């Protein structure tokens, strides 16, 4: 494979992958159906040299009722990165674990379970507290989590807080004469 487009053509012949989005010549993204993600990831690692899992992250598309997982892989020999995106329903946010393919994925999966509520059955230590010790509310990275309500219920007001509103502060910095 010499280009991302050639790699995409090969992947399309093997898996039902979506359109290729090229950010830069060395960085592209493709959407993969949930049920084909693991086999696509394994192929990319074993056959195409994408040996490094750079990151695993999520986006909460609240209005669409979806989570988007992005698995960013790197082929260090070729100096290229490929992101695989998979969409999950928010009300059934479960994805197969890939900790056996990339052991570091277990850490990312623990974080995503804790911060978004996405489940990765079989992932090691998945249900142990990771960052949010004693957390009882909905996962805080979900867009329906009310940060302001949580802050008001959890923290006391302190003097001077009302004078440090970021919008007011920036307005004073940018327009010191009140213009």
Regions inferred by a protein language model and the residue ranges of each:
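Terminal low-complexity/charged segments
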Residues: 1-179
């Amino acid at each position: 494979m010499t280009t991302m487009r050639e790699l995409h053509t090969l992947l399309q012949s093997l898996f039902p992958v979506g359109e290729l989005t090229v950010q830069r010549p060395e960085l592209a993204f493709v959407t993969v159906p949930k049920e084909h993600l693991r086999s696509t990831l394994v192929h990319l690692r074993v056959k195409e040299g994408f040996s490094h899992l750079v990151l695993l992250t999520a986006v909460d598309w609240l209005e669409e009722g979806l989570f988007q997982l992005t698995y960013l892989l790197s082929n260090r020999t070729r100096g290229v990165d490929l992101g695989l995106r998979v969409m999950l329903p928010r009300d059934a946010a479960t994805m197969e674990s890939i900790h056996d393919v990339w052991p570091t994925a277990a850490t990312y999966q623990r974080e995503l379970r804790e911060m978004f509520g996405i489940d990765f059955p079989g992932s090691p230590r998945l249900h142990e507290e990771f960052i949010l010790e004693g957390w009882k509310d909905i996962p805080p990275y979900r867009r329906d989590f009310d940060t302001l309500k949580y802050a008001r219920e959890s923290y006391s007001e302190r003097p001077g807080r009302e004078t440090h509103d970021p919008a007011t502060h920036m307005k004073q910095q940018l327009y010191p004469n009140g213009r």
